[in-house]
Amino acid sequence: MNYRLRKGYAWLGAVAALTALALSGCSTGQAEGSPDGGQAGRIKVAFMQPPKAAMHPYSDDAFKYSRLSASETLVRLNADAGPEPLLATEWKKTDDLTWVFTLRDGVTFQDGAPFNAEAVKNTIDHASASTTPPRALKGVKLTTKVTGDNEVTIKTDIADAMLPNRLASPQFSIFSPAAYGNKDGSVNTIGTSTGPFKLTEINGSSTLKLDRYDDYWGDVAIAAGIDASFVPDGTARAASIRSGEADVAETIPVSQVSLLDPKMVNEVYMPRTTHIALNTKSGPFADPAVRAAARAAIDQKAIADTIYEGYADPAVGILGPALPWAESLRGDVKSSAAPAKVEGVKITLATYTDRAENPEIAVQAQAQLEKVGFVVTQDVREYANMEEEMLKGGFDAVIVSRNTMIDTGDPLSALMQDFSCEGGNNISQLCDPKIDAIFSEGLKFEPGEERQKATMAAEAAVLQRSATIPVTHERVVQGEQGTWVGFERDPFERRLITEHTKPVG
C-alpha cells in the first residue's frame, strides 16, 4: 500500500476538546509585525494540566507541544484518524515488517541543523531506546536504517498495520540532533524542532513561551507567538475566558458553562471515557467477584445526569458514541463473575482534580459503593502528584478520564496500552494471556471492520473480567474568548493553535 502527498490536510472541522491559552502576566497581547506586513499579537492559552514530566517529549507532555504547533511528526492524523503527510511526504509498506518513508525537502530545524534521514533515525532510535519510550510504541519494537538522504526504512518485529499511526503520536516528534545526548536521558526541546512556533522558555509547571519561527517550511505563522499557562483549577480557567486573560481555555467544567457567553462555549463530542480502573493484581479487587460487586454498585445514569448536566452519556462499554461502529459490534460485556458480598471491605478510591468532574464523581461513587457495603477512603490530588503511584498499582480503584484515540487514533492500541501485560498505561494492573492474544491477533489487521471486531472483542474480554467500570462518555467544552479565529477543536486532543490561527477582523 502506498500513501502519497495530498494538497490540503483533512482537519476540516475535527471537533475536539483540547487546549487553551495563557493567563494574565504572560503576555500583554501587544501586536507585533508579521512577515506579510500584517499585525498579529501573541495568543494566550490556559491549559488544564501542568507538565507531568518536565515537558519530556516521550511523556503526555508531548501533546502540549503538538497543540501549540511547537513540534512535528513524520505523519499526522486527519479527521478520520487516517495518517496524512507532514514531515514525510510518502510512505509504502514493502513487506509485512518493512515500511519506507520519504522525507520532505526544504525543512530545517529551528537551530539551523538540516532535517534529513540521519536526524529522523536519531530521533526514532533515541525514543525506542529510552527507559520511558513513547506509549504508542508499546507492543512493537522498531529498527531503522538510512536508505537515502531523504529516505528512512523502518522495520517492526511483528506485523503492524498501524505503524504510520504510531509515528503520528506527538511522542514521536522529530527534534534536531542537538536535542539529544544528555546523560540523564532528557531531551532539549527549546528551539530544536521544525514547527511553526519555536519554544523559547519552560518555566517549571507554570508557563511556556513560544515565538514564531520565521523560517518554517510551510506557511509562516500569523501570530507572533504564544504564551501558555497551566491552570489546573477549572473555575480559574473559566474565569480567564470571561475576563479576557486567556484567548482559549481547555476543558471548561460543566458547572462553569452557564457563566460564559454562549458564543464562548464550543462543545466537542469526544472519544473520551471516564471509568473506574480496578486494581486486579493486589488488594480486595484481585478477587473478580469483588470487582463485579463494585461494578454492579455504580449507577452511571445518575452520575451523568447530576454531574455532567447533559454533557455526557452513561457508559455501557469502554468505547462510546464518538465511534459510531462500536455499539453495533459490541459483544457480551457483562461480568463473568457473580458479585460477592462486600460488607466491611475497605478500599481506597483515588482520582485527580485536574478534571473538575472527577472529584464529584468520587463523591457519588463512594456513596454508591458504600451502599452495598464497601468502606471507602478517597485520595484526591493533582494528576502530576499521583501518576507514578497509579501506574504502579498504588490504589484499589482510580477514576480515570481516557481518550481512546489519543495516541494512534486506533482504539485497539489504546486498549492494549491500558489492559495488556506490557501496557504502558495499565492502571488496572491487568495481565491476562488470553486478552493479550486478542490484542496480538488484532494488530495484524489493517484499519477497517476486522480490526474493529478485534477491538470490540478486547473490550468484551476486559469488561467480562470487570477490570474497569465504564462510567460516562464525555463531551468537552473548549472556551474561546472571541479574540482569535482558527482554533482547532480536535477530538484526538493533539491540535489547537496552528500557523493559520489569526486575530478576529
Can you say where each PLM-predicted feature lies in the sequence?
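Surface-exposed binding/hinge segments that line
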Residues: 92, 98-102, 136-179, 201
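Gly/Pro-rich hinge or "lid" segments in bacterial periplasmic/extracellular proteins
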Residues: 168-219, 225
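Ligand-site clamp/hinge motif
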Residues: 212-258
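Periplasmic-binding protein-like
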Residues: 281-322, 360-361, 462-467
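Long beta-strand-rich cores associated with HINT superfamily self-processing modules
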Residues: 478-505
